[in-house]
Amino acid sequence: MMSTATETMTDLDSIPPVMTLTQNAADKIASLIEEEGSDDLKLRVFVTGGGCSGFQYGFTFDENMNEGDTEVHQLGVSLLIDPMSYQYLVGAEIDYSEGLEGAQFVIKNPNATTTCGCGSSFSA
């Protein structure tokens, strides 16, 4: 007698991403990558000590994924997050805005307990 096993697959679309991008942010990232002329570039998002609230966000382009990095693919672009920054960025949203204060990436972070007035630093 032959038996069959039923396997339950998890719908990956139902798992919330580590970080989310707005369409504005994804479009700007794609535009910057196109300007650089390298399709291998990914946006590295990180947290460092500093700023008036204790931690600050940083952005840089990187072609290499380091050991322990988490890679997030959304809306046609890729983000890299190092293991230390991951705990501070999980669940955050990256937007891109242009206003009176200039153009900038803005992070809406549910892990931040306080943020400074300019939004570039936070405490957790």
Curated annotation (Swiss-Prot):
Source species, domain of life: Bacteria
Pfam families: Fe-S_biosyn
BP terms from Gene Ontology: iron-sulfur cluster assembly
InterPro entries: FeS_biogenesis, FeS_cluster_insertion, FeS_cluster_insertion_CS, FeS_cluster_insertion_RrpA, HesB-like_dom_sf
GO molecular-function terms, A-Z: 2 iron, 2 sulfur cluster binding; 4 iron, 4 sulfur cluster binding; iron ion binding
Entry keyword Membrane: no
PANTHER family: IRON-SULFUR CLUSTER ASSEMBLY 2 HOMOLOG, MITOCHONDRIAL (PTHR43011:SF1)
Job of this protein: Required for insertion of 4Fe-4S clusters for at least IspG.
Protein name, UniProt field: Iron-sulfur cluster insertion protein ErpA
Primary gene name: erpA
